[in-house]
């Protein structure tokens, strides 16, 4: 089902093989982004696939059994493909964690899987980029277990310096900070800049 694809990808699955689009269609089950509905319970299609733009739910229900199954199956296949594309785009945008958390909130039983991510998020640290072009979004307590946050937490805990003064300042527009003019200008404001530990935040 489309709902399970983001979770599977986040857990490392990269190949899918499913006959669900046909099996669901045989029982008039219509796949949606966050649920599965009986076709008889739907009045309007929000999907824009070639089936849903040409037929209404009532029209599909009136078709002969074989043709009806074919139409629903084609839509279901589109729904699965669309979800795969949304997951791929969320990875490209660096938003897979946010997308997975959003999808898990579509159903209470599915949200029970959140424990898998929060209790085992250390496994994701090594495969998650520490630096991203976009800021990360923090919505709830579960987000404190994001791999990026755990990675920085581990870095801070292991970091040691003999310098007794720390200066916290806003992150530079270009990274790494120590190669920028902003950093050079900042250092010039202190008489003994080599004895100071400069820390940048965003």
Positions of predicted regions on the chain:
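C-terminal extensions of enzymes
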Residues: 49, 53-202
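Glycine-rich phosphate/ribose-binding loops and adjacent secondary-structure elements
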Residues: 1-50
């Amino acid at each position: 089902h489309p709902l399970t694809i983001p979770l599977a990808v986040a857990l490392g699955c990269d190949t899918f093989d499913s006959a669900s689009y046909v099996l669901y269609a045989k029982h008039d089950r219509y796949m949606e982004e966050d649920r599965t509905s009986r076709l008889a319970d739907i009045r309007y299609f929000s999907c824009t696939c070639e089936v849903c733009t040409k037929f209404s739910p009532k029209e599909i229900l009136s078709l002969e059994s074989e043709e009806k199954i074919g139409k629903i199956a084609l839509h279901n296949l589109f729904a699965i493909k669309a979800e795969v594309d949304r997951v791929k785009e969320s990875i490209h945008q660096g938003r897979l964690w946010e997308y997975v958390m959003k999808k898990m909130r579509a159903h209470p039983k599915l949200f029970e899987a959140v424990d898998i991510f929060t209790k085992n998020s250390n496994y994701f640290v090594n495969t998650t980029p520490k630096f991203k072009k976009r800021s990360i979004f923090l919505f709830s307590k579960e987000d404190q277990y994001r791999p990026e946050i755990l990675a920085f937490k581990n870095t801070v805990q292991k970091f040691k310096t003999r310098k007794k003064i720390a200066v916290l300042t806003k992150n530079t527009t270009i990274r790494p900070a120590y190669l920028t003019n902003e950093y050079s200008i900042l250092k010039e404001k202190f008489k003994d800049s080599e004895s100071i530990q400069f820390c940048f935040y965003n």
